[in-house]
């Protein structure tokens, strides 16, 4: 339990710190992670010990993701108007993410456990960890890659869309949800873009389901083609 309480305390503290104007651009999760790593190293505590005492956080991620369904249920009309673009785009995104990640791993001669750990990096953490386990990956590495992917998307996505003059809330929401999962979706919420948040929520849920279903089959097919 000490790991859970420490993590929550550090996160709340970092949230208040980043409200200062000169630190407003620093991602809370990145700052909190850095402080936690420093504390664990200074106290000579093993990662296993910390992880065992902070396991509640991983458990909470599941219900927290499901809670995004509330704004989705209030905006079903948005989904109905964009269903073809949403479902088609997500299927294409899922297959491309799995395929390109696998091929890049092979190109750089990465070992199978590392490649399998990378495949679900665009899926929300609870689902990504389970997918990684099923494929034979390293769950801890997967969790780190999921956070890094979400941070990168959350920090750069809206700026990139603005640069490319993409203003469609549907396109932005689906893209962010499909690639940056909960962290990207939370950025949509912070910017008070409800339509983006709704479609981003839908995208991250469907992306998790598609990746879980497609990853084993895509990997098996690519292994046959590459060997």
Task: Write out the residue ranges for each language-model feature.
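Helical membrane-embedded segments and adjacent short helical loop/helix-boundary regions
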Residues: 1-7, 11-73, 78-89, 93
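Entry/N-cap segments of selected transmembrane alpha helices
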Residues: 4-6, 76-101, 143-152, 201-209
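Membrane interface segments of multi-pass transport proteins and intramembrane proteases
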Residues: 19-26, 162-165, 224
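Small-residue-rich segments of transmembrane alpha-helices in multi-pass membrane proteins
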Residues: 30-42, 62-67, 88-101, 119-129, ...
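Short helix-capping/hinge motifs at transmembrane helix termini and TM-loop junctions
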Residues: 43-44, 109-110, 136, 165, ...
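Alpha-helical membrane segments and immediately flanking helix-loop junctions
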Residues: 72, 112-141, 145-148, 167-202
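Transmembrane alpha-helices that form the ion-translocation and gating core
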Residues: 88-128, 149-164
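Juxtamembrane boundary at the C-terminal end of a transmembrane helix
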Residues: 106, 214-227
């Amino acid at each position: 339990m000490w790991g859970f309480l420490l993590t929550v305390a550090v996160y709340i503290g970092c949230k208040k710190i980043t409200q200062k104007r000169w630190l407003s651009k620093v991602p809370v999760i990145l700052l909190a992670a850095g402080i936690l790593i420093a504390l664990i190293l200074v106290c000579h505590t093993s990662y296993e010990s910390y992880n065992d005492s902070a396991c509640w956080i991983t458990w909470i991620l599941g219900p927290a993701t499901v809670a995004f369904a509330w704004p989705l249920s209030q905006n079903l009309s948005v989904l109905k108007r964009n269903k073809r673009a949403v479902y088609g785009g997500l299927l294409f995104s899922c297959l491309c993410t799995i395929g390109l990640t696998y091929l890049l791993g092979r190109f750089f001669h990465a070992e199978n456990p590392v490649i399998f750990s990378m495949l679900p990096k665009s899926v929300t953490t609870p689902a990504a960890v389970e997918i990684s386990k099923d494929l034979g990956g390293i769950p801890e590495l997967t969790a780190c890659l999921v956070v890094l992917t979400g941070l990168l998307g959350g920090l750069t996505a809206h700026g990139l869309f603005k640069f490319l003059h993409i203003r469609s809330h549907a396109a932005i929401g689906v893209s962010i949800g499909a690639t940056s999962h909960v962290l990207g979706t939370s950025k949509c919420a912070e910017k008070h873009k409800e339509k983006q948040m709704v479609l981003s929520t839908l995208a991250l849920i469907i992306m998790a389901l598609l990746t879980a279903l497609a990853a084993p089959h895509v990997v098996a097919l690519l292994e046959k083609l590459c060997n």
